[in-house]
């Protein structure tokens, strides 16, 4: 007997994801950057940067929560999280330009060391003492490295979500599949119950004839509706 498909898929668990840990670190570091290097009042960049950083982690969380009923919503929210990191990266690049500096080249030993550290550590607890002590230019470059690592993780997540959508479809499709399977299961149970009640071969044949008549009647009704 076929298993009835689930309507609400497993969801949540975003706090166990490395990409969420990195997004939390990016948010906390951005708040610290604004506190250390930007004026407390009168600079709209402070709100823009903190909101972009917060939006990333919030959309990851909301997408994870929505994935049980809507894979489409999950994909959209994860894409929003990815887009906000592009915006935030531009803010850090602008800060470097304002200081007359450029981002570290990919082959720069500092960039390579930052990438290694970022691959090994995602939690804010590991990054906090580093960001509290580094000058503005190093801070910006470290953030650019972290942001790019997180964007790559989000790209992989979006690709997996797209495959899940192809496999499981939307909630309406799953509801239809579940209803269809449930009707089939109910029909199967009715047939088996009817046949199991037979006590003789003649009785079994009579019950089978009755089932065939019901099937023919159902087919006729369907054709008339068409």
Which residues make up each language-model segment?
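Amphipathic alpha-helical assembly/interaction segments
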Residues: 1-226
């Amino acid at each position: 007997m076929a298993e009835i498909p689930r309507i609400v898929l497993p969801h949540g668990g975003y706090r166990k994801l490395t990409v969420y840990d990195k997004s939390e670190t990016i948010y906390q570091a951005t708040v610290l950057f604004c506190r250390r290097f930007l004026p407390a009042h009168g600079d709209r960049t402070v709100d823009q940067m903190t909101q972009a950083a917060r939006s990333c982690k919030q959309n990851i969380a909301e997408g994870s929560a929505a994935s049980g009923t809507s894979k489409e919503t999950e994909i959209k929210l994860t894409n929003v999280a990815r887009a906000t990191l592009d915006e935030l990266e531009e803010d850090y690049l602008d800060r470097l330009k304002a200081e007359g500096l450029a981002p570290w080249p990919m082959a720069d030993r500092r960039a390579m060391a930052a990438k290694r550290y970022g691959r090994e550590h995602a939690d804010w607890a590991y990054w906090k003492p580093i960001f509290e002590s580094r000058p503005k230019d190093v801070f910006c470059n470290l953030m650019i490295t972290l942001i790019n690592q997180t964007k790559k993780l989000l790209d992989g997540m979006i690709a997996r979500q797209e495959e899940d959508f192809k496999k499981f479809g939307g909630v309406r499709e799953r509801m239809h599949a579940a209803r269809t399977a449930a009707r089939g299961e109910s029909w199967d149970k009715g047939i088996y119950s009817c046949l199991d009640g037979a006590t003789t071969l003649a009785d079994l044949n009579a019950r089978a004839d009755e089932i065939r008549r019901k099937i023919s009647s159902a087919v006729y009704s369907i054709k008339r509706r068409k």
